Structure formats: structure tokens, C-alpha cells
Curated annotation (Swiss-Prot):
NCBIfam families: asnS (TIGR00457), PRK03932.1 (NF003037), PRK05159.1 (NF003483). Homodimer. PANTHER family: ASPARAGINE--TRNA LIGASE, MITOCHONDRIAL-RELATED, ASPARTYL/LYSYL-TRNA SYNTHETASE. One of its GO terms (cellular component) is cytoplasm. GO terms for molecular function: asparagine-tRNA ligase activity; ATP binding; nucleic acid binding. Belongs to the class-II aminoacyl-tRNA synthetase family. GO terms for biological process: asparaginyl-tRNA aminoacylation. Its EC number is 6.1.1.22. Its main location: cytoplasm. It is found in: Cytoplasm. The gene is asnS. This is Asparagine--tRNA ligase.
Length: 440
């Protein structure tokens, strides 16, 4: 005998008038004398199961009475359409099998503090809003990979353990690697995915990345996921066009397939419907002027001298002036990574762009045209104080058939936070890793 249910909540409309078995967990229960209403969730949705005392055995009614929040059970009954019911359908209960009891479930309908909920993250993911956020996360990841695959990209997996820093920073998690010294958890797969680009033309990597940054902002995690495409024979303008098509396709897919989850989150869908190409573009110079002209509108967005990078308040201020994501391009080379191609007409700035999401969500993509001249790349490695011997393999990519190429990295959690309207990034990943959190 199979333990699998004969239907799911997501497919219940196909079974009106039929006898089915559902399997799931009790989300909520209401007793009204001889009637017991069980709101059952099965991972695909929720449905109201109506237990009428006169229609079931004494044992079944007693089981219904004994069910508590998050008890697991199998419920058999007849499917009935009812506009008044949550989701438009109900199950008239005939039999209930208690599979796993739940005693004093800690997350109750009352308000709980964030620390309590994070300590119980393994249970919190069952709640309606967390379920909706993580459903949308899964959709974003699927949409991103499927779109790239359809565009002819090849997934190219890159190592998580590396011998060097990709971006020349000290914010690395280190571990001992046998007799070879230190290894580091990858900050990005970009350098390695460039090798794949030389083989396949259009590639991407997808996986976890790690930053040992002592930051406690609502935008930062120490472990997060990135998808990083790289394209041969592509310049800075090609790169921005690819990004706006990519992001727009992801948002459209979520609107098409996860609209009900967005409603659970009370997301203003009209704002997402505006996310269509082309995205506005401003230069770093223009952004500096914009910040100076609108100082005081966003707390902490004080005027910046030319040459300084933006903080979160500056990104919020810039993005507030646009109704969709905005590119800020041509940053000073000094505040960007060593591998970014200088503008040939103005070498002090790089052919790069950050894509800022509206509504205060900040940078969701960082990208650039890469340096393809081996001599210039070697100069930049030295100028950043990096050990040349650590990057010989990376220089080889320029020594043997170099081509202009571009790419970008998109942080999954920041995109999910923006699309779902989630204020803090910790809710956009199943088990967030932060400065003061590594449990559960």
C-alpha cells in the first residue's frame, strides 16, 4: 500500500465530486460543536476539511478533536466546490489518520520576536509568509537558470574552495587545506567561469558564496547564493542589455506563476509590472550630483566626494527617483575590482555598472566588461597589491586567444527580498548565516 496521497491541494480542482486522500499538516483548527474545521496544508496549498460528527465514525471524530497545530495526518473525503471556502474548495471528511502528533508547537498565532523566530527557523519556514517567500525564491532560481539555458548558456560549475581571493579583499573564510596551506571559501565564481567562457562562449555558474564581512545590515549575509553569467565577445553595453532582459524575464515569470504567493505577502504587484526594459541608466558622476541635489531626503545619504563608493542610503536615494531598476555605470576604477576594463576614453573610470532595485533594496547586480589585455591585467594585479604568481592561470586566459568579454553576478537573496517586498534579507534564504547567527 502506498503512503502517497491521491491528490494535492494544488490539483484539487480536478477532483470535484471525487473521493481523495490528502496528506499534510494541521495549519489551524476550529471546533463548533458537532462541526470541526481543519485547515490542512500539504506544501502545495491549504484546504478546509469539514468534519461533521454525524457523517463520520466516533473514532474519526475523536481523532479530529485530538488534532493540534502542526499534527501530521492523512484525510480522506469528497471534494466539493464552495466559493465561501479558502481557495474555493472544501473536503467533506470521511476518515482521518493521525500520522505524527504535535505537542505544544512553539510558534503560535500570537506575535513572536525576531530572535525567537530565528531560533526556531526550522519551524518558522512552515508559516504562510515564509512559505510564500521561499516558494518565490525557488521560482526565481528556476526562472534564472531556465532563461539562461534557453539563451544558449552552459552551466559551468566553479570551486567553492579556492587558493586566492577573486576580488583582492581580506573578507575571506579560511580553512587548512592538507599540506598546501590555507584555502578560502569562494567569494565569487567569476574568475573560474571566465575560463569556461573561453570554452563555451556563454556560460554561468550558480552556487553559494561567502563574505566574512562584519556587517549587521538588513542587506547582508555571510553566506548567500549568486548566479554569474559570462559572455565572450560582449562589451559593457551588451552586458547591461543582457541584465535588463534577464531581470525582466525573472520578474515576469514570478508574476505569472507565483501571483498567489505575492498576494499572501500583500505585495504591490503594480510595482513589479513596471519592470520591463529598457532600464534607466545614469553615470556615477550623475549619481554624485543627484545625491548632492537631494540631500536630506534619505537619512544617511550625505553628499559624497568624487571617488567614494555608495553606501546603502545613497543607493536608496538614487533608486527612489526611478520606477524600475536603474543602472549606475562607470564607477571610479579605484573602488572596483582589479579585473574591470577601464573606459578607453576616460581611464580613471571602469566599464562597469551596478543595478539598483527600487523601494530601497539596493544593488542586486554588479557587472563589468573585463580586462582582456594581459599586460594591462598584470599591471592591475600588481597595483592592487596581489601576488602575481597566484593569478598566472587567470592571465593565461588572456595569453591564449583573448577576447573582449563581460559578465555579472546577481545575488539571489537580494532579488527575492525586492520581488517579495521582504524588508530583511534573512527571510529570503532557508537558514541564514549572519555575523551572530550560525544556528540552526
Amino acid at each position: 500500500m502506498s503512503l502517497l496521497p491521491t491528490a494535492t491541494v494544488a490539483t484539487i480542482a480536478r477532483h470535484v465530486g471525487q473521493r481523495v486522500t490528502l496528506a499534510g499538516w494541521v495549519y489551524h483548527k476550529t471546533e463548533k460543536g458537532k462541526l470541526i474545521f481543519i485547515l490542512l496544508r500539504d506544501g502545495s496549498g491549504t484546504i478546509q476539511c469539514v468534519t461533521f460528527k454525524k457523517n463520520v465514525s466516533e473514532a474519526t471524530f475523536a481523532t479530529a478533536q485530538a488534532l493540534t497545530q502542526e499534527s501530521s495526518c492523512r484525510i480522506t473525503g469528497s471534494v466539493r466546490a464552495d466559493e465561501r471556502a479558502p481557495g474555493g474548495y472544501e473536503l467533506d471528511v470521511e476518515e482521518i489518520e493521525l500520522v505524527g502528533p504535535s505537542h505544544e508547537y512553539p510558534i503560535t498565532p500570537k506575535e513572536h520576536g525576531v530572535e525567537f523566530l530565528m531560533e526556531h527557523r526550522h519551524l518558522w519556514v512552515r508559516s504562510a509568509k515564509q512559505h510564500a517567500i521561499l516558494r518565490i525564491r525557488a521560482e526565481v532560481i528556476a526562472a534564472a537558470q531556465e532563461w539562461l539555458n534557453e539563451q544558449g548558456f552552459v552551466r559551468f560549475d566553479t570551486p567553492i574552495l579556492t587558493a586566492t581571493a577573486a576580488e583582492g579583499t581580506t573578507n575571506l573564510f579560511a580553512t587548512d587545506y592538507f599540506d598546501l596551506g590555507k584555502a578560502y571559501l569562494a567569494q565569487t565564481g567569476q574568475l573560474y567561469v571566465e575560463a569556461g567562457m573561453m570554452s563555451f562562449g556563454k556560460v554561468y555558474c550558480f552556487g553559494p558564496t561567502f563574505r566574512a564581512e562584519k556587517s549587521k545590515t538588513r542587506r547582508h549575509l555571510t553566506e548567500f547564493w549568486m548566479i554569474e553569467p559570462e559572455v565572450a565577445f560582449a562589451d559593457h553595453e551588451d552586458n547591461m542589455r543582457l541584465q535588463e532582459q534577464f531581470v525582466s524575464a525573472i520578474v515576469a515569470r514570478v508574476l505569472d506563476r507565483r501571483r498567489e504567493d505575492l498576494k499572501v505577502l500583500e505585495r504591490d504587484i503594480s510595482l513589479l509590472e513596471q519592470v520591463v526594459p529598457p532600464f534607466p541608466r545614469i553615470t556615477y558622476d550623475q549619481a554624485i550630483e543627484l545625491i548632492a541635489a537631494h540631500q536630506g531626503e534619505v537619512e544617511g545619504a550625505y553628499p559624497l566626494p568624487w571617488g567614494e563608493d555608495f553606501g546603502a542610503p545613497h543607493e536608496t536615494l538614487i533608486a527612489s527617483k526611478f520606477d524600475r531598476p536603474v543602472f549606475v555605470e562607470r564607477f571610479p576604477s579605484a573602488v572596483k575590482a582589479f579585473y574591470m576594463q577601464p573606459d578607453p576614453n576616460r581611464p580613471e573610470v571602469a566599464l562597469c555598472a551596478d543595478l539598483l532595485a527600487p523601494e530601497g533594496y539596493g544593488e542586486i547586480i554588479g557587472g563589468s566588461q573585463r580586462i582582456h589585455d594581459p599586460d594591462l591585467l598584470e599591471q592591475r594585479i600588481r597595483a592592487h597589491g596581489l601576488r602575481l604568481e597566484d593569478y598566472q592561470w587567470y592571465l593565461d586566459l588572456r595569453r591564449y586567444g583573448t577576447v573582449p568579454h563581460s559578465g555579472f553576478g546577481m545575488g539571489i537573496e537580494r532579488v527575492v527580498a525586492w520581488i517579495t517586498g521582504t524588508r530583511h534579507i534573512r527571510e529570503t534564504i532557508p537558514f541564514p548565516r549572519q555575523l551572530y547567527r550560525i544556528y540552526p
